[in-house]
């Protein structure tokens, strides 16, 4: 019979809290500009930890920022999953809803979406975050005949490019109707995947689950 892991002692809790604080600080820097040139001292000060604590957790800034991106992408992917898995089953609707939820999350989860804006393109084929979830939905859609027969990774690349364009549009043109832009781009993506035009338009505008925190 499996047993639960023993509770962390005080030292282990403090160590875990320090690591989380460093990752949180790195995420803030990434969200602000995408720049990774901040000094270790600046990161430690933002995290409110001692300079020497940094090297107890990370060998370099690169390792820290990689961990921060992975942490943000995992949280982003989980947020999408929480609102769609078990609620939406149609692969086409999952793809469309993912686009539209991302646009909404620019308001409800701005830090996550800003990190996606600055760092998402290089992680389109990552094994972390939203990429494996999107690939899962594409593969299901192709296997079921919902989407046209195509190479799933190529389809994922095309979808990722459109999603990143939507994110950039959301921040660079706040005057535009983000909901409408997301629905339009979701519709075009579904058509690209082989969904008939009229159906793509309808699917891309179905009611969405509510995002926590809205």
Language model region names:
Residues 1-6, 136-144, 172-214:
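C-terminal peripheral helix-coil segments that are non-catalytic and often amphipathic
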Residues 9-13, 17, 59, 63, ...:
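Residues at secondary-structure transition points
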Residues 63, 67, 74, 78-114, ...:
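Hydrophobic alpha-helical connector segments
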Residues 74-81, 96-97, 101, 119-168, ...:
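Amphipathic alpha-helical packing segments from all-alpha helical-bundle domains
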Residues 83-87, 116, 166, 170-173:
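Secondary-structure edge/capping motif, primarily at the C-terminal ends of alpha-helices
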């Amino acid at each position: 019979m499996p047993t639960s892991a023993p509770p962390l002692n005080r030292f282990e809790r403090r160590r875990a809290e320090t690591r989380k604080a460093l990752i949180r600080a790195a995420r803030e820097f990434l969200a602000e500009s995408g720049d990774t040139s901040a000094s270790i001292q600046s990161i430690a000060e933002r995290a409110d930890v001692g300079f020497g604590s940094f090297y107890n957790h990370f060998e370099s800034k690169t390792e820290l920022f990689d961990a921060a991106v992975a942490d943000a992408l995992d949280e982003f992917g989980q947020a999408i999953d929480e609102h769609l898995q078990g609620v939406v089953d149609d692969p086409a609707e999952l793809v469309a809803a993912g686009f539209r939820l991302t646009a909404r999350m620019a308001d409800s989860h701005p830090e996550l979406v800003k990190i996606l804006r600055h760092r998402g393109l290089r992680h389109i084929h990552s094994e972390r975050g939203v990429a494996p979830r999107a690939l899962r939905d594409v593969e299901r859609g192709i296997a079921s005949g919902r989407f046209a027969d195509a190479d799933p990774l190529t389809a994922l690349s095309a979808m990722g490019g459109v999603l990143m364009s939507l994110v950039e549009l959301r921040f660079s043109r706040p005057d535009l109707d983000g909901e409408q832009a997301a629905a339009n781009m979701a519709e075009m993506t579904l058509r690209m995947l082989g969904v008939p035009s009229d159906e793509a338009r309808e699917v891309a505008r179905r009611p969405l689950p509510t995002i926590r925190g809205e």
